[in-house]
């Protein structure tokens, strides 16, 4: 593949990963919060229509990713770990045509705040299992497992968000 040196390089809008030397719980939560912020940043300046636009053949859009991450925050931390009754979310359901960037991001931020309450309340017991698992026939995971899993889940989808945003308007960066 030949590189076009005449085209200007896209401007990068990077958020830098946190740099701290802290205990395990603080480090894990700080990295999770960093990734959550990266996902939200990918919606900045987009119209609702663009954010709903599928960027790949699977139909995934930036707003779908935000909705999905909202659901997994609530499902893992509140439903599975703490045992709350949260309304299930169907990954296969199409995005409603009237969803907005502002509304979706607000719902995600609210889910993050609720999840963080659970995370902070369990800081002293990282190995204590939660109430149940989202995985059939699996033991309830510990908070340590949940934090690592959510870093992986959110990081994977932050990468998807990077690509979707670049496909929409050429924006690059974390």
Stretches found by the model and what they are:
Residues 2-17, 25-44, 48-92, 132-174:
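Short, contiguous alpha-helical
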Residues 22-28, 101-102:
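Active-site rim elements
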Residues 94-131, 142-151:
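Acidic/histidine-rich alpha-helical segments that form the ligand environment
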């Amino acid at each position: 593949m030949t590189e076009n040196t005449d085209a200007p390089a896209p401007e990068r809008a990077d958020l830098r990963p946190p740099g701290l030397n802290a205990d395990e719980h603080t480090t894990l939560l700080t990295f999770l919060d960093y990734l959550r912020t990266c996902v939200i940043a990918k919606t900045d300046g987009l119209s609702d229509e663009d954010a709903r636009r599928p960027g790949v053949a699977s139909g995934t859009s930036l707003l779908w990713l935000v909705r999905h991450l909202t659901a997994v925050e609530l499902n893992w931390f509140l439903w599975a770990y703490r045992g709350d009754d949260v309304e299930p979310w169907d990954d296969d359901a199409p995005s409603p045509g009237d969803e907005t960037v502002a509304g979706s991001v607000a719902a995600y931020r609210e889910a993050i705040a609720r999840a963080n309450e659970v995370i902070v309340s369990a800081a002293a017991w990282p190995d204590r299992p939660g109430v149940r698992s989202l995985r059939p026939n699996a033991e309830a995971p510990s908070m340590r497992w949940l934090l690592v899993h959510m870093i992986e889940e959110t990081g994977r989808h932050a990468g998807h968000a990077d690509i979707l945003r670049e496909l929409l308007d050429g924006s690059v960066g974390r």
